[in-house]
């Protein structure tokens, strides 16, 4: 067995753009023959995948599944809506979710490692960067899920609720985007930040500080209600809050998770005409 030196790994990395571990693995399998390693990487799609790795994958799908007292929610990204609807991409996302459920996996890095070879092969086949972005698990007595198309997925856990109520609550979370379950769950950091913003606004109106502070107290109560599930008007019956609805059913929400495709990912806007012009100058 030939020695796989750091300089050899570095050279292969520079020539292919692939990751260090992928290069080391390819060289080991090729017994230190760099040309054979490159040929094998081309065949496996590893080089193509490495070139696509820098592309922003902000489209994709959300998948949910409930198994017993555990709910699973997964986001897998690609670059375009077209690929998000592709059968091969959808099947890959389903397979990843099934593996998470079967193994009770809540660590996305474990899933990434498990499916890296399949991901690389799919990138080579489809021609877009693909990323297993995140996985979350929710435990509860009664679980419900809702999917708004493939782009928004919600899990809700509750006590004392039936499946229909939990499904309606999941639909509400999808539409109203609460950040917390109850107003008292809003973190001190979030409250303080909003308080300072509202106080600055009130002070700019020329009111004395004492009056401005009283105004802000009322606004803060409204704010914590707006960002919490139980404080929001129920989307299917806005005359009552979600908190009132739960009280009527003698039920309680213990947690929820809401995923939306691409949230938090900065999408690069491309000027197609400029891109074509740039490519023509290079050729």
Swiss-Prot record:
Location in the cell: Cytoplasm
A cellular component annotation (GO) from this entry: cytoplasm
Keyword Transferase: no
GO MF annotation list: translation elongation factor activity
Name of a matching Pfam family: EF_TS
Region feature Involved in Mg(2+) ion dislocation from EF-Tu, mapped onto this chain: 80-83
UniProt keyword terms in alphabetical order: Cytoplasm, Elongation factor, Protein biosynthesis
Signal peptide: none
UniProt main location, coarse: cytoplasm
PROSITE patterns xrefs: EF_TS_1, EF_TS_2
Stated role: Associates with the EF-Tu.GDP complex and induces the exchange of GDP to GTP. It remains bound to the aminoacyl-tRNA.EF-Tu.GTP complex up to the GTP hydrolysis stage on the ribosome.
Family: Belongs to the EF-Ts family.
Name of protein: Elongation factor Ts
Taxon lineage: Bacteria, Pseudomonadati, Pseudomonadota, Gammaproteobacteria, Enterobacterales
